[in-house]
Amino acid sequence: MTVTVKMLVDKLKLKVVYGNEELLAKAITTADISRPGLEMVGYFDYYSPERLQLVGMKEWTYLKTMTANNRYSVFANIFREETPAVIVARGLEIPEEMLQAAKENGVAVLQGRNSTSSLSGDMSWYLNSQLAERTSVHGVLVDIYGMGVLIQGDSGIGKSETALELVKRGHRLVADDRVDVYAKDEGTLWGEPAEILLHLLEIRGVGIIDVMSLYGASAVRDSSQVQLCICLEHFENDEVFDRLGNSNEEIELQGVKIPRIRIPVKTGRNVSVVIEAAAMNYRAKQMGYDATKTFKDRLTDLISKNGED
């Protein structure tokens, strides 16, 4: 996905001190952010001009100790054609030499009201999510008790109908039919809907419904971390399904592994309640309580007692 300086300005509500339409349309190609401290003393080895340049209180205070000519020289070297923008934090005053060098080199100058660390964190979070490589998977993503559950299965097995029932039970729809997944970092997988399918759910026999319009803003989310995969499968008498919770199946998406639970589907079974229970049980395991282990311990104790008798 392409992220422009204008998109960053709109997302973080930054003030444009200098920058025309062309400069604000510049693409940001990396989520890495540079604080040009060493560059201000003339050290440009390993300098990355393609990064956003963030000036905080430390850099600003040091600039005040320099002469006007030195300040201009520093910014003339920092600002390159490939530099997307420079952001000054805390609403600090923009040095005239910075503006002059920015105009000469075609670099937008932005100003934020937040602290430097807060601004840096917000920019990194936004850019990492927007610039991450995406993969589209078939399924439905639902937020169940704050946990992202990816529901997969054959076409027509009832994924969307199950998601609708979960929404009616107070959970939140993230994406239907196509889920765009991406890794925000090494161990965190996120999912979001395609823009054209935002808040929409397709129900066979009914058509497309707008979940936000019908059930309100509390029934939808624009994105969610993906923590569990539920695979719906047609029930077959000769098929073996996990009955104790011993299964350790996983799927890998974008290099991130998440647990997978296979659930058989047959007439009369309330799949949405089963998925809800599976999500709660998984969360309980994450918190240290394992019902399967409890059952095994009780069974072992019972066998021991019977053996003694």
UniProtKB/Swiss-Prot annotation:
Superkingdom as given in the UniProt entry: Bacteria
Ranges where the record places region Important for the catalytic mechanism of both phosphorylation and dephosphorylation: 201-210
Record-linked InterPro entries: HPr(Ser)_kin/Pase, Hpr_kin/Pase_C, Hpr_kin/Pase_Hpr_N, P-loop_NTPase, Ser_kin/Pase_Hpr-like_N_sf
UniProt GO BP: regulation of carbohydrate metabolic process
UniProt: Mg(2+) binding residues: 160, 202
Subunit details: Homohexamer.
Function, as annotated: Catalyzes the ATP- as well as the pyrophosphate-dependent phosphorylation of a specific serine residue in HPr, a phosphocarrier protein of the phosphoenolpyruvate-dependent sugar phosphotransferase system (PTS). HprK/P also catalyzes the pyrophosphate-producing, inorganic phosphate-dependent dephosphorylation (phosphorolysis) of seryl-phosphorylated HPr (P-Ser-HPr).
Annotated domain remarks: The Walker A ATP-binding motif also binds Pi and PPi.
Listed name of the protein: HPr kinase/phosphorylase
Organism of derivation: Streptococcus thermophilus (strain ATCC BAA-250 / LMG 18311)
Upper classification of the organism: Bacteria, Bacillati, Bacillota, Bacilli, Lactobacillales
